[in-house]
A protein has these predicted regions:
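Ferredoxin-like iron-sulfur electron-transfer modules
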Residues: 165-190, 198-225, 234-243
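Intrinsically disordered, low-complexity linkers and terminal tails enriched in Pro/Gly
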Residues: 95-106, 146-170, 244-249, 284-299
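Proteins enriched for Cys/Gly/acidic motifs involved in redox and nucleic-acid/cofactor modification
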Residues: 104-192
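Cofactor-cradling patches in redox/metallo enzymes
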Residues: 7-132
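Generic secondary-structure signature for well-ordered alpha-helical cores
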Residues: 31-35, 84, 137-144, 193, ...
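Flanking helices and flexible, charged tails adjoining ferredoxin-like Fe-S electron-transfer domains
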Residues: 1-3, 213-323
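Short structural boundary motif marking the start of a folded domain
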Residues: 3-5, 176
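Short glycine-/small-residue-rich Rossmann-like dinucleotide-binding loops
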Residues: 69-70, 196, 228
């Protein structure tokens, strides 16, 4: 009997509820392969850690294929931070030594289940059939036909198409927070010392953790630039080295930016980004609870004047004491 593999298709950010033609074809083709179960969720980076999608994923015991508009390492560590853990599987975009490092890194937090997570970047593919074939090769089922065995074609809509996958509905909004690659992290706590917004904390082993992700200022990647190990990612950032591209040299943060940005080094640039974020509006707070109307003061005095009268009365009372 063929072991079941869960296929997770994460909607790209801002995508409407209906799948585009590319993702639709991929979903149909993979759902037609025996032993593959396809699940559709909103954009992976925007999912709440305690939301229904992450709760569902944490309950899975099977191997997992992740198709998301994120670099594979970023997707892997986003899931890891939410308790969806496993071994990083080799794909065409990840070298074998990189996957081995992620499995055996000394700074990996918590136990690692004996299952594999294969992560694919949807943005790297233009041919859905190529992506389907690479998924099948990665999970050891290369050469299997991917015809629509269930009578579903890539252009079909309606009840039969809807039955091809399982969809988890979850209301999301655009998020911005750091993701730590614990294979690269050396526990220097530079991120904790540098960030002014209370994003970071430490666990029981004094290792850094993203404690308050919602406190991070949107658009600020300063801690990623200051990290000496290049362990901090912002998956939505425009710079591939910060967003988690496995092929982007970590030294690019130190070399290219120094040349492009008028000689600014990473520390100076990070300080400028932090200062700009500090002066920006803080993340939106939840609406305050409505307060009942306060009764008007009993006399014409209020505010500071009333406080002065109370103070004068207190002084007079003290003067009358027989001390």
């Amino acid at each position: 009997m063929t072991a079941q593999v869960q296929v997770l298709i994460s909607r790209p950010p801002g995508e409407p509820q209906s799948l585009d033609g590319f993702a639709r074809t991929v979903a149909y083709r993979l759902a037609a392969v025996p032993g593959l179960k396809v699940t559709l969720v909103p954009h992976l980076y925007d999912l709440a850690p305690d939301g229904p999608a992450m709760q569902y994923l944490r309950g899975l015991q099977t191997d997992l294929v992740v198709l998301a508009a994120l670099y594979p390492r970023a997707a892997f560590w986003v899931l890891d931070a939410c308790g969806v853990r496993g071994r990083l599987g080799r794909t065409p975009s990840l070298a074998e030594e990189e996957t081995l490092e992620a499995l055996t890194g000394p700074h990996r937090q918590g136990p690692t289940p004996q299952r594999t997570l294969w992560c694919f970047d949807l943005r790297a593919y233009f041919d859905p059939e190529l992506l389907v074939q690479e998924v099948l090769v990665a999970i050891g089922r290369g050469g299997l036909p991917v015809a629509a065995e269930k009578g579903i074609s890539g252009s079909q809509t309606g009840p039969a198409a809807e039955a091809a996958w399982h969809e988890i509905a979850e209301a999301t909004s655009s998020r911005w927070y750091p993701v730590i690659d614990f294979q690269q992290c050396n526990d220097c706590l530079e991120c904790l010392n540098f960030c002014l917004f209370g994003v970071y904390g430490v666990d029981k082993a004094d290792r850094p953790k993203v404690e308050h992700p919602e406190a991070c200022r949107p658009g600020c990647p300063a801690c990623a630039r200051i990290c000496p190990a290049g362990a901090i990612m912002f998956p939505q950032h425009g710079d591939p080295a910060i967003a988690g591209d496995p092929h982007a040299a970590r030294q690019a943060l130190r070399l290219d930016l120094s040349q492009v940005l008028r000689g600014l080094g990473p520390a100076e640039l990070a300080a400028l980004e932090r200062a700009r974020a500090l002066n920006a509006d803080p993340p939106a707070a939840p609406p305050a609870e409505p307060q009942p109307p306060q009764p008007p003061p009993s006399d014409s005095l209020s505010g500071a004047s009333a406080q002065l009268v109370d103070l004068d009365t207190l002084v007079d009372d003290v003067d009358k004491l027989d001390l």
